[in-house]
Amino acid sequence: GMALSESLKKSGKDYIAAVAMGNEVVCRMGTAYLGDMYYQGFHPTSTCGMMAASVTAAKLLGLDVQKTIYAQGIAGSMVSGLMAWNTEGSFTKRLQAGHPAMNAIIAARMASKGFNGPSDIFESKDGLLHAYSFQDHYDPKYITEGLGEDWTFTKSSIKVYPCCRYSGGHLDACLEIVAKHHPKAEDIEKIEIRSSKYTMHLLAEPCKWAPRNIVDLQFSMPYQAAIAFKNGQFTVDELNEDYINDELVKRLIASTTVVMDDEFERRYPAHYSSAVTITMKDGTQYTATVDDPKGDWRNPVTYEDVVNKFRYLANRTYGDSARTEAIVEFVNSLENQPDMSKLMELVNDVR
């Protein structure tokens, strides 16, 4: 959306409208798979994200209804993205966010020139819902029910931590224990995490007890708990490969067990619940339970929280607080901005 808005010199309002449409598609499509696409080995960031990006691109290109349908059909035929990266911490995890956006623009531009695609790309017997679902476990009603009236993306989450969104619950619980009880990491005997089945599948496979790189750290429940108790936080500073060989971190990882909680599994995927219990060397136990992690629409962050997160990350990248504040000021009045390319000039000029 930002790339096309830059090249087409679209206004802030144009950008907001296009992104809203794309976000609605990705949320509805993801919901239709009932939380199970992962079990089929597909990566929703890529598979659902490409369909969303093609709608955003079509809107920015000013395509009519028929050509927007073509764009969806073309994009659906180009969808890809496997979860294979998860066992090796492969960088294809990153690729599967940018690659679908690139292909979505290609799909929309092809449609703009009259190249057609299947109009029933979602519901066809050989379409996306069947092909990418786990054992045909999907519900097509979520694609169109209340479309244009009930904006489902307004209930999507904002990530608080620089790692997998499924990590939010147990990290919130760990840091709640830290804030309330101030346990010394050296005195922790063991850590137990209760979670849903898929969260375990993603973050607590046996290989997650031996992380090797930064991507692994972002998808390792034992590491995240260990470093949260050691450092009392989980920021980009904790995504440091030096910690992999830290003796205390290694001991805490080895002391961590993860078990499925039947109630949390029943509530998934509507809720990403988690609970953490630590046992100290003197036998004292501390527990925290999180129904909905921070950033969920039922446990929301504030706009200021989001801005501060951006400031923290942008200042690390740019080393220039003046530029960071210029970006914040631009976005604060995004709906009144006549030319999105001005924002991209601020964002892209990294030296």
Briefly describe each language-model feature range:
Residues 1, 50-54:
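Short alpha-helices
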Residues 1-34:
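Hydrophobic alpha-helical hairpins/lids featuring a short glycine-rich hinge
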Residues 10-14, 31-41, 54-75, 82-94, ...:
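Active-site cavity-forming subdomains of large catalytic enzyme subunits
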Residues 14, 92-102, 109-351:
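Terminal-appendage/accessory-domain detector
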Residues 18-25, 71-75, 194, 330-331, ...:
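Short acidic/histidine-centered micro-motifs embedded in hydrophobic/aromatic stretches
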Residues 21-28, 56, 74-81, 103-110, ...:
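Alpha-helical scaffold segments in carbohydrate-active enzymes
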Residues 44-50:
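Active-site histidine-anchored catalytic micro-motif
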Residues 45, 77-86, 197-205:
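Short, surface-exposed loop/turn segments at secondary-structure boundaries that line and modulate
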